[in-house]
Swiss-Prot record:
SUPFAM superfamilies: S-adenosyl-L-methionine-dependent methyltransferases. Belongs to the class I-like SAM-binding methyltransferase superfamily. MenG/UbiE family. The gene is menG. Methyltransferase required for the conversion of demethylmenaquinol (DMKH2) to menaquinol (MKH2). Its EC number is 2.1.1.163. S-adenosyl-L-methionine binds at residues 60, 81, 106-107. Pfam families: Ubie_methyltran. Keywords: Menaquinone biosynthesis, Methyltransferase, S-adenosyl-L-methionine, Transferase. Pathway: Quinol/quinone metabolism; menaquinone biosynthesis; menaquinol from 1,4-dihydroxy-2-naphthoate: step 2/2. It comes from Staphylococcus aureus (strain JH9). This is Demethylmenaquinone methyltransferase.
Length: 241
């Protein structure tokens, strides 16, 4: 496992403090590309109407909202996050959506029954979890057999030109954003470190497979600065035997 045994209290503190400016910060740091990436991921998912989805580390609810629209009024979407303040922002944004429920909880101990959801997503949240593999195994547990898991996260660019740009961005641009938006050095440093230290796409794919997911495929975005991992929980072939 990477050296990302995150301190829960520290991460919780960071997101409690940045909750009200998180959406704006996300837009600026990604140059609003996160919206483009998520739209493409939703297209790849092909979410069916009337299904049940879980958005892990839902934050302020952007992906939760996209899932709500996709499953329609007969479907259900649950968002879960460990930051109460982030959830409060999310609740304001989803107040008119009757098929959405937001709950407080831990990605490594999901408070749901086994085989509960058709889709489980996590967007820009896995890097903030103390143990990636434990969280992925929990996502597998609550996913229905044959269900789909999707992760959209920052990644490590592989193309030389993007690797150079990425390094320059972290060295010169991120500090400016951090000083503008973070209340403390701790917040700024965490936002930077959690992104830069996150595993590359091939290592993360292996983690998905170790967690029990099958047919895992990867799609890179913007030269590899972000990546989608999409996989499935194995179908239960014992039914009907």
């Amino acid at each position: 496992m990477a050296d990302n045994k995150a301190n829960k209290e520290q991460v919780h503190r960071v997101f409690q403090n940045i909750s009200k400016k998180y959406d704006r910060l996300n837009n600026i740091i990604s140059f609003e590309q996160h919206k483009v990436w998520r739209k493409r991921v939703m297209k790849d998912m092909g979410v069916r109407k009337g299904t049940k989805a879980l958005d892990v580390c839902c934050g302020t609810g952007d992906w939760t909202i996209a899932l709500s629209k996709a499953v329609g009024p007969t479907g259900e979407v649950t968002g879960i996050d460990f930051s109460e303040n982030m959830l409060e922002v999310g609740k304001e944004k989803t107040a008119s959506m009757e098929n959405v429920k937001l709950v407080h909880g831990d990605a490594m101990e999901l408070p749901f029954e086994d085989n509960s959801f058709d889709y489980v997503t996590i967007g820009f949240g896995l890097r903030n979890v103390p143990d990636y593999l434990v969280a992925l195994k929990e996502m597998n547990r609550v996913l229905k057999p044959g269900g789909m898991v999707v992760c959209l996260e920052t990644s490590q660019p592989t193309l030389p030109v993007f690797k150079q740009m990425y390094a320059l961005y972290f060295k010169f641009v991120m500090p400016i954003f951090g000083k503008l938006f973070a209340k403390s050095k701790e917040e700024y440093e965490w936002l930077q470190q959690s992104t830069f230290n996150f595993p590359g796409k091939e290592e993360l794919k292996r983690m998905f497979e170790e967690a029990g997911f099958i047919n895992v495929r990867v799609r890179s975005f913007t030269g590899g600065v972000a990546a989608m991992h999409l996989g499935y929980k194995e179908k239960d072939n014992t039914k009907g035997d």
